[in-house]
Amino acid sequence: MKKVLDNHGALRPMAAAILACLAAPLQVLAQSSEQTLPAVTVEGTRSVSDRNQYPVTTESMTADQVADTVNAVTVEDALKYLPNVLVRRRFIGDTQAPMATRTTGINASARSLIFADGILLSTLVNNNNQNGSPQWFMVAPDEIDRIDVLYGPFAAAYPGNSYGAVTEIVTRMPRQFEASAKITTANQQFSQYGTRDHYPSTQASVNLGNRAGDLSWWFSVNHLNSFSQPVTYLTINQSATAATGSAPVLAGAIADRNRTGAPIQVLGAGNLTHTVQDTAKLKLAYDVSPALTAAYTLGYWQNNADASSQSYLTTTTGAPYFGGTGSVNIAGNAYSASGIGSLFSSNSTDQAHWMQALSLKTTNSGPLSWEVIATHFNYGNALTRTSTGPYPLAQSAGPGRIADASDTGWTTLDVKGTWRQKGRGAQHSVSFGAHADQYKLANPTYSTSDWINGDKGALFSDSRGKTRTEALWAQDVWRIAPDLMATIGGRYERWRAYDGFNFATSGSGTGFPVNQPEVSDSGFSPKLSLTWQATNDWSMTGSFGKALRFPTVGELYQNVQTGQSFTQANPFLKPEKVLAGELALERRTSDSKLRVSLFEEHVSDALISQTSSIPGVAVPVSFVQNVDKTRQRGIELVGQKKDVLIKGLELNGSLTYVDARITANAGYVATTPGAASVGKRTPYVPEWRATAVATYKPDEKWSYTLAGRYSSRLYATVDNTDINPATYQGFEGYFVADLRIRYQLDRHWSAAAGIDNLNNRKYILFHPFPQRTLYAELKYDF
């Protein structure tokens, strides 16, 4: 460990904080055979895994913890200090924010699941960091009652997508009339390459709720207005051709190297985004009887976003340059003016999403309980307009393309129940359920003569298809002895992909439609866990689980296009087959927690994006392919302690090491001479991650929080040829510190101020991430 800390200077202060919160004295394990499992606590304080007796390592955040410790503008902010969780939110208001876990990366959105009150927020129409990103915006931070993150595929109630993690967001329902209003402002100071500016954001929300007799309701509205830093940079490969004397001379380009180490010129910034979002949500709950409750949720979200480009290039007169004809002179070398011009574009997005859920569940404490929940998510409107004409004229007019995902959506149905053996000596609690879902992706792109206001023209490309899954599952929690509990379960799933269709337009304008074949698969995933309650404080749990993660519609049928508009769909992808295990030793007291977990995961046919050469295409193309085998193993240390040294000081921390490797990849084709993938690190999984949070509450009014997040660098390619992480499209290691101060003025008013990235770490995770950001918050509770 000393060597590791010496090589990671930023990790030293965080490791010290983590070790401090783990410093509670270790007790010798008692040898009593009469120890029993902990008593059941009040329902409202228990995690989802405790309530359902899932044998899964779980970490949680409550509403009070979020309010005290997190500068939260959107709900995904609440997860930032949980162990081994990274939500790739590039800016406030980002709609492409997938979640990474301890063994899965930020481009693998379908390897984790996000629910809010049983409603699926994960967009399982794809497995990427774009149109596969979760629908976080359907939950407001003020709604949160608690958030639980469950690690690993050890609960039969969840599909194989859970092998990364499951995030369960539980929202509040009022017991009496309540109302609140909050406004949060943020201002980011950003400076990188040729961009130096401030980017503000404002979020305002109003919440109303009440309970009258058997009916309770909650209504909330949220408005977000946000400006982003550059999301992309515009680069061109370094030219080896000397410029002629007649070529116009341009200044402002910045020499750098790309992630493989080749020289490039950075010419500008792209996708500086202004987004305006509104969310409205209604929740109703009605007690049909003392033992039965019906609930309905309706959510609506709309987004209007505009993105533009910035040029660093200037002419000899100082005017900005966006491309043209012929060649130009940059630092003495010749570059194509039209090639430069093709880098600049603008786009606008108009989205409206609807979410509905209907549930019926028992609330009695009898031997049998059950629940039925149906959900539907629909993209009522999802248009993205992009310019293709010359810049900057394209900012106000000109040709372009319109991508329309308006017919995308999904429907889920779950029926589940639990039978609990009652009476003295009861040994079993059996849970069971059935699941069905359908996912639909529609993503046609049309040409248009007016990208801003024009109608759709000729079809340019299309990707569409459907998947359907049916599943049956069961789990038995068996108390073998007073201090020993086994959980045995399994899940059978049947999957089908159908109605796949692709359309592509060649460089000559010829269209190529392809009807893709139907594919299907099925399988059984056993689960086994054993928990030993050694003492009242100490427990040990060993878990094993198999998981099947079936391909999404996007992985099967999504077009892959280069500048030559080439389509490469692969409807014959195989499901990921996961074998995972974890051994967790945990100590819990009234004021502390310590957990050490050893985990290992073997994935066969891992679905990973690779790059290769394809006949007929002059440049390498990225596509999804099954990698034969990957293996991830590691150790995780998590601790929490209240009243450390002084009353009111609480420390939380986590430290994780993961050795993630590709162990077999027969389909690999090297694009760099001498490169290989076997033995290289699994893409997007860092070697080290850590978090540390120190919160001091001297009284009931004030709270002060200082927190830190650390990650080592990671690789994005299967052959690890991206040797330069500190550049656009690279993946750097980082340490960032955050600060928050909150004051409760009285029973109605509270205020908070904070700073994210206090140390102003300038880092890139493919995209440039936010630099130092200031926050201010004011809230009124009725």
Each language-model region and where it sits:
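N-terminal periplasmic "start-of-domain" segments of outer-membrane beta-barrel proteins
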Residues: 38-70, 95-98, 126, 184
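Extracytoplasmic beta-strand/coil segments of soluble accessory domains associated
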Residues: 76-123
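Short acidic/polar hinge/loop motifs at secondary-structure boundaries
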Residues: 119-153
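Gram-negative outer-membrane beta-barrel transporters
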Residues: 182, 482-486, 593, 599-603, ...
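Transmembrane beta-barrel wall of Gram-negative outer-membrane proteins
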Residues: 196-308, 352-357, 361, 470, ...
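Face-selective signature of the C-terminal outer-membrane beta-barrel domain
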Residues: 285-301, 340, 344-508, 515, ...
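Outer-membrane beta-barrel signature, preferentially recognizing the C-terminal barrel domain
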Residues: 341-355, 360, 461-469, 516-525, ...
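Surface-exposed extracellular loop regions of Gram-negative outer-membrane beta-barrel proteins
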Residues: 438-449, 496-507, 518, 532, ...
